[in-house]
Amino acid sequence: MLRRAVLLMLFLAPFLLGPVGSAKALFESRDDRLGAIRSIGIIVAVGDQFTFAKSGLGTDRSSRSIGIGEWGVDEAIAKQVGELVGRRFQVTPVTWSRSAFFADSGTSPGFSMFRGDRFAKRVQSEVQPQGLDAYIVITKARVDLGAGGRKVDGLGLITFRTLMETYTALHAFYEIRVIDGRSFDVIEEMTAGPLAADLRKNLRLAGPARLYEGSVTAVTDAGDAGLHRAILDLIAQSLPMTLESMHLR
């Protein structure tokens, strides 16, 4: 029985550790691995689209999206993250294939036992320069909308309709990975959680969100300055808490 268990672990080890994983990852703690990082690159693939969705009684379950590349959301996130982690790490500018990362961003699941983490593979093949100690990768997260298996991701507005009221929530669902720049193991990963204010308002969304008082029907393109400011402010409030929880500050 013991021999079978040992053989099973030896068979599964390459899949559990990833294609380039090593026994080192088994014995080093997350803090040890983060502590060894000096140079770091920041990759962001969140702000290509903004989605409008509805949920609740008698609502149309279809959604619509607008392109928001001109808002510079990814650039704003990269700048803020660089400032927050730059006190601890040497932030090195990197370039990457935006289309490649957006193709995977917001899809689920992120990890396959047999193929490893898809974003770790993207870092290995689509990012320059290679050879940094680690890369911070920020992408869209998917969260449940209600109990029917429906999901939403990234940036957007959700209009909720109940028997008593109708209200709209602005959301910014994202996740952060820290990927080893040599082994391409995922050192740490986290999906951003709700802000304290979200919990008090009982928005029931598993990520950063807040009530939105502006007009939703009037938004037809990316020219809405108020919505632009609101989403950047929501992300700016969430990032410090998320990075702190990941021990990156």
Show the residue positions of the predicted features.
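Extracellular/periplasm-exposed beta-strand and loop segments of Gram-negative cell-envelope proteins
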Residues: 109, 162-165
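Positively charged n-region of N-terminal signal peptides that target proteins for export
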Residues: 1-4
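Bacterial N-terminal signal peptides
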Residues: 7-18
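A solvent-exposed, charged loop/short amphipathic helix patch at secondary-structure junctions
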Residues: 52-71, 156-161, 207-221
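C-terminal/domain-edge helix-coil "capping" segments
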Residues: 22-50, 142, 153, 164-249
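Active-site microenvironments of hydrolase-like enzyme catalytic domains
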Residues: 149
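N-terminal segment of the mature soluble domain
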Residues: 55-146, 173-193
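General N-terminal leader/first-domain-start detector
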Residues: 17-86
